[in-house]
């Protein structure tokens, strides 16, 4: 069995790490590079950086901090934000990122997934999916431009349909951002994860809702995800990554040292 991955997520806006609740009301957490270094030293398996307003602002992620991060950490990291072409992705990978993640641009142009997978290999291409549970319809719906409250909108895609579509087009990994749980810290949406897991054949990363160590264990044991992504519990030092891995080992879950 492959070891499960623990992945801190750093939302970036205006060159700083920020964190919101349910994708709103972001507060500044701190500078990018020291946080990245701290997480690498604590034992994170990889890091994910989202330039959260790049797509809605119509620009590509700022590459200057990508290079600075690459200099100070020795674990893989993934970068997302406004990547609309193979050229955009190439620049970010050249600056030191190991993977690129696309979300809103893939919804606007699904062919982009295939173009990137063909050029860089599926192992480099992550698709982020922002999924919102609509209580009225009882459906999980994919949302777009979630980095900017004023531009966030529902798409025509239901989550499981989009998961299947992006796999067909060459996604090497899927990060499922569960919007209703984001920043609330009351646990991952296990029901949704199981639903997506049933149609997802590539590595699946859970995102949104981690508040305690047992939430990570539940995602791994009850939904069989490959990795668990979290932000506020790490930023606010509610959970230490080294201690989390120790706890998971005690639960019989295989993690990397």
UniProtKB/Swiss-Prot annotation:
Heterodimer of HisH and HisF. It catalyses: 5-[(5-phospho-1-deoxy-D-ribulos-1-ylimino)methylamino]-1-(5-phospho-beta-D-ribosyl)imidazole-4-carboxamide + L-glutamine = D-erythro-1-(imidazol-4-yl)glycerol 3-phosphate + 5-amino-1-(5-phospho-beta-D-ribosyl)imidazole-4-carboxamide + L-glutamate + H(+). One of its GO terms (biological process) is L-histidine biosynthetic process. The keyword NADP does not apply. The active site is at 11, 130. It is an enzyme of class 4 (lyase). It comes from the Bacteria. One of its GO terms (molecular function) is lyase activity. It comes from Vibrio cholerae serotype O1 (strain ATCC 39315 / El Tor Inaba N16961). Its EC number is 4.3.2.10. It holds the Pfam family His_biosynth. It is found in: Cytoplasm. Belongs to the HisA/HisF family. SUPFAM superfamilies: Ribulose-phoshate binding barrel. This is Imidazole glycerol phosphate synthase subunit HisF.
